[in-house]
Amino acid sequence: MEKLSANKIRQLWIDFFREKNHFFIESKPLVPQNDDSLLWINSGVATLKDYFTGKKIPPSKRLVNSQKALRTNDIENVGLTSRHHTLFEMLGNFSIGDYFKTEAIDYAYEFLTKKLKLDPKNLFITYYDGDDITFEKWKSLGFSNEKLIKGSRKTNFWDLGQGPCGPCSEIYFDRGPKFDSRGSELIKNEIENDRFIEIWNIVFSEFNNDGQQNYTPLKSKNIDTGAGFERIVSILQDGPTNYDTDLFLPIIAEIEKSTVFQYKIENYFLKEPRQTQINKSFRIIADHIRAITLAINDGVQPSNLHRGYIIRRLIRRAYWNGKKLGISHPFLYKLVEIVGKTLDYRFDIQTISKIILNEEENFAKTLEIGYNLLESQLKINKNQIKPVTVFKLFETYGFPVELTKEILAEKNIDFDLSQLVEFQEKHSQISRAKKTTGMQKVINSLTQIKAKISDFIGYHTHHIETKISFLANKDEEVAETNGENLSYVIFEKTPFYATAGGQKHDQGWIIQNNSTIEILDVFKDKFLNNIHVFKGKIVKNQPVFLKLDTKNRLNLERNHSGTHLLFASLRQEFGSEIKQLGSDNNENRLTFDFPLNRKPSDQEIKSVENRINSYINQKIKRKYLVTNLEEAQKLNAIMTLEESEYMDPNSLRLVIFDKITTDLCGGTHIENTELLEKFTILSCQSKGSGIYRIRAVTSWNKYFEFLKGKIQEILSKISALKNKIKKIEPNFGLNLPNLVDLEQQFDYLKKIEDDLKIYYKKLLKSQLRIVKSELDANKIIEIGKFSFYLDFNLPLHNLKQIAATWREQNPRISFILGANLVNNEFLIIVSSAILASNQILEKILEIFTGSGGGNYKIAQGKIQKKPEKEVFIKLLWENITEF
């Protein structure tokens, strides 16, 4: 067995299967594209789902990938066990109706023994009882009965309850008795252990389950393989755990620079309790920073919702474990660069680091206070914790509920979760995604289609009378639909374009027996038939009339052609290295994602827009050319995998705008650039580090809609600025002229807005100059270890700005300021960098009867009258432990 680097192992995998005529699929982003059933890409096959369901045509019947995936459903085991991770990589080889059991087993055996040079003596195999072909094949490769372990339906049959399913065969590597003195009974009895490591699972998809446990053979049999990358690396590098490899050790070494503690590999065998806890913290940090970095790179921003909550939770769990290693300052952001090197991945290091640093700084401000609150509550309640305290730790101090549970578990303390269910559902939308494959969500009736039975004629024809080739509900083919549920129909000829290549499907109507039924969706099956989704009553053996919504089609064509021109203009502006990472065109707008190592300037985006409008003014005709791959390459045609998935390499359709761009595309397009009328870029925003998304519209109508919206937005901002200025200068006035021309009105109002911003800032500076003098020491009150500044005699204007300024200048002091309002009401503002301002205000409003709100840093409200200072001081003394 040869010791190989992780990057070398990954490349060996890809190269091996390429030699076996497999098409390599690049690792896709962790955030699923157009798949609401998954929170994250959680398996190697998840990105290939549409190929297995027949919704997309694969670029080859043989595929290979190395897909990064993310799971957080068993996060508490990360760092505790040898092999649990949040981010992991799955090596996969797949056959879609091509080779089957014999070849799949041959490939697995050859790769492991010839390429990785693993000793066959160390390999153990499981197989499904009754799968004689698999048993005999492994036996022919030299495996004895002792090495071939019979599995049950529970262990060796992959079945999701409905749809394609079949037996599987697992490959285990025996690392020897130093890891466990017990033998193969560990595999037979499914006992968790570190001796026999499952490194490969081959699923033989050969049956269809109708949902009633009736199994019939599939005509097209598939192979779905998953090999654990981190596990294979640990075996080849002789690491006791997955963490003791070049995937994690460089990250751990970087963490060691921030702490006096060291990670010790040998402790796996020594099991010294204190070092075990130290190693656990190192592993958690090293694991989590990989997931954090890739997720942010793929566009997920830390937040309190959905995917963002999970990333925030990982950051805070990692930061807490840094605290346990004695690290009292932000450090995770420093690990981003080394993560990129270990994964052989390019990141926008600066942007990702900045996002992580900001999260660390925010959590650091509340961590100590929150932990002290937890400790004090445990002392008061004799090691019992109230659900309200757990809620407050999250709501006020940013402690994820799961982190609080872990801290309590380390102290051997349980707490009642029943009162937190509603809170968790609202704030913790955490993935409970099961280990799924791309064989889910199959519309059973569509599996009955065996060939291409329809032609798309919509490039030139917009309406036609035709016949029905196939009619079905979700479960079976029917002669007539009931009109109550979604139904599926294939026509002999159709003018309706199916969603593909970033272009949304056409809209229109089915007309039969004086009944008009709306088309809801159109998608392709694996034979390139256009499947039309509708809800209504139609009969199969009667003709139908199909009518395209031509206005909608024109808008789709404008936006699709606009996307091609945008891509060309971006390449002109930033260079030929600009790639299309994604696009989405519907009837209302278009989006385009592209990579760039910096944020495009406003001038550059304007230049891109102006260039496209010059293409429009040139009135360039669109041409179509059908050719083969070789000729397309000679024409320097721009080709994306998304487009090539739907096309025969011997019959490629090129869309040509002379002297601008030649692109492989199956979509619909305008006949001449002048039909775009006007191209307007609405925004260019960062989608994640190093990836930017342009949103744009085409046509004069959409442009004027955009202008009207922007004008209303600017008028609202002008009104708000005017009101702010009048609070400082009551006599300030502003009259706006009535301009008919929308463009003139927009330009004029934008200038007014900019001028008002400048004027307001000047007024603020002059106001704040008054408050930047030293604080009155007589108004500072010490309560316990906290300092408060109380002043109820300040001017009303800019009181919030004064509070914020003083807080920034004096971060160790909490400010409670007040000013008189009309009708004897009193304004209270709380501003603190170290205590929860909103919690302090909440208690004030509770005692003095009032209303208001705010956030951790600043909060404001009003009460019935000006309070007495002595009452306030008493209030602070009585409630200091709750703030």
From Swiss-Prot:
InterPro entries: aa-tRNA-synth_II/BPL/LPL, Ala-tRNA-lgiase_IIc, Ala-tRNA-ligase_IIc_anticod-bd, Ala-tRNA-synth_IIc_core, Ala-tRNA-synth_IIc_N, Ala-tRNA_ligase, Ala_tRNA_ligase_euk/bac, Thr/Ala-tRNA-synth_IIc_edit
Superkingdom of source: Bacteria
Enzyme class: ligase
Co-factor binding details: Binds 1 zinc ion per subunit.
A GO CC term assigned to this protein in UniProt: cytosol
Pfam families found in the cross-reference section: tRNA-synt_2c (PF01411), tRNA_SAD (PF07973)
Protein location: Cytoplasm
The protein's Enzyme Commission number: 6.1.1.7
Record-level Gene Ontology MF annotations: alanine-tRNA ligase activity; aminoacyl-tRNA deacylase activity; ATP binding; tRNA binding; zinc ion binding
Record Gene3D superfamilies: 2.40.30.130, 3.10.310.40, Bira Bifunctional Protein, Domain 2, Threonyl-trna Synthetase, Chain A, domain 2
The protein's name: Alanine--tRNA ligase
